[in-house]
């Protein structure tokens, strides 16, 4: 959904897509919660080891965040990212490992409540954000709307949050956590003003 919204330049189309996507997400979360606890095994993604795919995605994301830190000249971002990168490399290549089957996603009562909160409350905030962003961009006198990017990031954030609360694999949890961190950074700096960049 995030990609669809990113490429949706039409405000009227976005006003249909966002509420529809929020409705589907919220209803799916409630149905998931009503069905109760579950376990989901994911061994492969497109024929590749799921753990390897997530590790590569995590590595690429950390390199991207490191690049942001370099571009901004932020020692804090670069230092924190390097620590995470060292941890990932140590976990994957240095620690002696042995194959233990791990259920990729596990839902218990608490995680299902969290999915419902993220999807319903996050969805309502997203719908409210549509009107807010219209007024905000009018206030900033923007000629070209940044709303496609904004709503794409919001949906990516909500998806990563749901992945985070359902994930049963430490490596995968780090990836979802880093996605939420990057999305937060991008949302805080969304206006691209000096103040927004400093706050991000």
Residue positions per predicted region:
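Alpha-helical multi-pass transmembrane bundles of energy-transducing inner-membrane proteins
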Residues: 10-14, 149-200
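Transmembrane helix-loop-helix hairpins at membrane boundaries of multipass inner-membrane proteins
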Residues: 1-152
């Amino acid at each position: 959904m995030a990609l669809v919204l990113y490429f949706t330049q039409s405000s009227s189309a976005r006003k249909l897509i966002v509420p529809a996507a929020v409705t589907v997400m919220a209803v799916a979360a409630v149905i998931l919660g009503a069905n109760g606890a579950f376990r989901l095994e994911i061994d492969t993604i497109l024929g590749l080891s799921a753990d390897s795919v997530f590790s590569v995605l995590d590595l690429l994301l950390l390199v991207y965040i490191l690049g942001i830190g370099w571009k901004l000249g932020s020692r804090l971002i670069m230092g924190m990212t390097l620590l995470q990168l060292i941890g990932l490399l140590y976990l994957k290549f240095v620690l002696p490992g042995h194959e233990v089957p791990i259920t990729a996603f596990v839902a218990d009562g608490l995680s299902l409540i969290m999915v419902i909160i993220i999807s319903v409350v996050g969805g309502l905030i997203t719908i409210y954000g549509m009107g807010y962003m219209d007024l905000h961009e009018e206030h900033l006198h923007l000629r070209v709307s940044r709303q496609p990017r904004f709503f794409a990031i919001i949906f990516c954030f909500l998806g990563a949050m749901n992945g985070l609360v359902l994930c049963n694999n430490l490596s995968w949890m780090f990836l979802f956590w880093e996605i939420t961190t990057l999305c937060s950074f991008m949302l805080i700096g969304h206006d691209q003003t000096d103040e927004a960049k400093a706050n991000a």
